Swiss-Prot record:
GO terms for cellular component: cytoplasm. Heptamer of 7 subunits arranged in a ring. Interacts with the chaperonin GroEL. Belongs to the GroES chaperonin family. The keyword Chaperone applies. Keywords: Chaperone, Cytoplasm. It is found in: Cytoplasm. The lineage of its organism: Bacteria, Pseudomonadati, Pseudomonadota, Alphaproteobacteria, Hyphomicrobiales. GO terms for biological process: chaperone cofactor-dependent protein refolding. The gene is groES. This is Co-chaperonin GroES. InterPro entries: Chaperonin_GroES, Chaperonin_GroES_sf, Chaprnonin_Cpn10_CS, GroES-like_sf. It comes from Rhizobium leguminosarum bv. trifolii (strain WSM2304). Its main location: cytoplasm.
Amino acid sequence: MASTNFRPLHDRVVVRRVESEAKTKGGIIIPDTAKEKPQEGEIVAVGSGARDESGKVVALDVKAGDRILFGKWSGTEVKIDGEDLLIMKEADIMGIIG
């Protein structure tokens, strides 16, 4: 798992995309070339937090295991231990699911 081999710094998080369904509710199969990348993911690892104006570290609102929604163009795609992941700032996260 990426969290043991990579620790993001400051207010960054490592996210694993949650794959979308390959078939629509009506039964139409969507080929990989037509699929959009999912904007939902699971947090794998979190940084220690950002510093406020006084220099105090402010912890993140998210934690490893949270399911999140993020912007379409959020994050930087990386490959860690052979797994495709995203690294993004906490500000790129729109919300926590559940």
